[in-house]
Regions:
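Residues that recognize and position ribonucleotide moieties
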Residues: 4, 142, 182-183
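Short loop/turn motifs at secondary-structure junctions
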Residues: 23-24, 96, 127, 160
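N-terminal glycine-rich phosphate-binding loop and ensuing alpha1 helix
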Residues: 1-58, 114-120
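Small/polar loops that bind or transfer phosphate-bearing groups
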Residues: 30, 76, 181
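Short amphipathic alpha-helical face segments that pack within enzyme cores
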Residues: 11-14, 86, 184, 188
């Protein structure tokens, strides 16, 4: 899904652009079987460059070259696809002891009239120094398709999360605020993942 083209570039490129806008320039990818195209996309391909050079598509080449100059890319493989928690834990070797952003590239977040979602989240992190998760309101009948948060409102656009429930039935959902694929996590998440037994949620 990450390589699905939207207009002139794949979803993953938009995710990297969003991270750069938020001030993040070390891109750490957790990949798996069949995801080699991700690594290839962020690498030089002299054959492809030679074909595109001088053509009407050279601007695409310039765009990816510029992106590659602005950040570093590192990759590690998830041995088995065991969910998001395991993918984040697999990335520990690349993250070390720093807070970090998570972009699930198959959630395209566009804010045409302002800052990107991750940039807004960085400001919240800088103020509160805690993990931050992005949410969006969904119709009540659709809550069983998402992770849903419970919590207490701090301000108009900010909620202190007390619980996250994966795909609850509409009658059991604490809200209609669904988690979307943007997180800022602190390194203690790795300890929490270690202490959490595997499960479908």
């Amino acid at each position: 899904k990450e390589m699905l083209p939207i207009l002139t570039k794949p979803l993953i490129h938009y995710g990297v652009d969003e991270a750069l806008e938020a001030g993040m320039d070390n891109m750490a990818f957790v990949t798996g079987r069949g995801k080699r195209a991700l690594e290839d996309y962020f690498d030089r391909s002299y054959e492809l460059e030679d074909q595109i050079s001088g053509s009407s598509k050279e601007y695409l080449l310039d765009e990816i070259r510029a992106l590659m100059k602005r950040c570093t890319f590192s990759f590690t493989r998830q041995e088995q696809m065991k969910g998001l928690g395991n993918a984040i834990y697999t990335g520990k070797i690349l993250i070390r002891d720093e807070p970090f952003g998570v972009v699930l590239a198959d959630d395209l977040c566009v804010n045409e009239n302002g800052e990107g979602v991750l940039a807004q989240m960085v400001k919240i992190y800088e103020k509160y120094r805690c993990s931050v998760v992005a949410v969006m309101e969904v119709p009540p009948q659709d809550v069983n398709k998402y992770g849903i948060i419970a919590g207490k409102s701090i301000s108009d656009d900010l909620i202190m999360v007390s619980d996250m429930i994966e795909k609850p039935e509409p009658s059991e959902a604490p809200s209609s605020l669904a988690i979307i694929g943007r997180y800022i996590l602190t390194p203690n998440i790795f300890d929490l993942i270690e202490q959490t037994a595997p499960g479908k949620n």
